[in-house]
Amino acid sequence: MAFVLSLLMALVLVSYGPGGSLGCYLSQRLMLDARENLKLLEPMNRLSPHSCLQDRKDFGLPQEMVEGDQLQKDQAFPVLYEMLQQTFNLFHTEHSSAAWDTTLLEQLCTGLQQQLEDLDTCRGQVMGEEDSELGNMDPIVTVKKYFQGIYDYLQEKGYSDCAWEIVRVEMMRALTVSTTLQKRLTKMGGDLNSP
């Protein structure tokens, strides 16, 4: 019994210590999930993107905000979380269910949900009481406007197959940017609790 208690105490100390692996660290698993989600989007196309060129639109992906030095470390995590949450919301709708192969769509939504759950472990620790303030943070507002533009576009186009194909390609870009942001966070130290 004493051995088990000692083992549990050691695990707790390691988990919350500066080198703890159970703290808010961006894991390899998160990066693997991101790559897998990108791979799932590729075969979801029903049409050739070339057949939908007339429906192309620049949605204003905030790529320069994410890839440049505009985001501070304390802003990067909420932006990453918001991008993944909005991507999940987009593909977890009745309209998207009608547009895509159900199996691939379910796998994509499961992968996005897994990424969000992994990040959610850190979210409370990183965002804490500031959560309500972060909803009004300029980068978050920019991400929300970006996705609102996508929703508006789909509605304007009547959720057509070409509109969904354009959005699929755009979401591949968005997930690539999210992956870049995850890499930046890892380079910033990976520990989302450190200043």
Swiss-Prot record:
<keyword id="KW-0051">Antiviral defense</keyword>
<feature type="disulfide bond">
    <location>
        <begin position="24"/>
        <end position="122"/>
    </location>
</feature>
<comment type="similarity">
    <text>Belongs to the alpha/beta interferon family. IFN-alphaII subfamily.</text>
</comment>
<keyword id="KW-0202">Cytokine</keyword>
<dbReference type="GO" id="GO:0005126">
    <property type="term" value="F:cytokine receptor binding"/>
</dbReference>
<keyword id="KW-0964">Secreted</keyword>
<feature type="disulfide bond">
    <location>
        <begin position="52"/>
        <end position="162"/>
    </location>
</feature>
<keyword id="KW-0732">Signal</keyword>
<dbReference type="InterPro" id="IPR000471">
    <property type="entry name" value="Interferon_alpha/beta/delta"/>
</dbReference>
<dbReference type="InterPro" id="IPR009079">
    <property type="entry name" value="4_helix_cytokine-like_core"/>
</dbReference>
<keyword id="KW-1015">Disulfide bond</keyword>
<dbReference type="GO" id="GO:0051607">
    <property type="term" value="P:defense response to virus"/>
</dbReference>
<keyword id="KW-0372">Hormone</keyword>
<dbReference type="GO" id="GO:0005125">
    <property type="term" value="F:cytokine activity"/>
</dbReference>
<dbReference type="GO" id="GO:0005615">
    <property type="term" value="C:extracellular space"/>
</dbReference>
<keyword id="KW-0635">Pregnancy</keyword>
<dbReference type="GO" id="GO:0005179">
    <property type="term" value="F:hormone activity"/>
</dbReference>
<feature type="signal peptide">
    <location>
        <begin position="1"/>
        <end position="23"/>
    </location>
</feature>
<comment type="function">
    <text>Paracrine hormone primarily responsible for maternal recognition of pregnancy. Interacts with endometrial receptors, probably type I interferon receptors, and blocks estrogen receptor expression, preventing the estrogen-induced increase in oxytocin receptor expression in the endometrium. This results in the suppression of the pulsatile endometrial release of the luteolytic hormone prostaglandin F2-alpha, hindering the regression of the corpus luteum (luteolysis) and therefore a return to ovarian cyclicity.</text>
</comment>
<protein>
    <recommendedName>
        <fullName>Interferon tau-9</fullName>
    </recommendedName>
</protein>
<dbReference type="GO" id="GO:0007565">
    <property type="term" value="P:female pregnancy"/>
</dbReference>
<dbReference type="Pfam" id="PF00143">
    <property type="entry name" value="Interferon"/>
</dbReference>
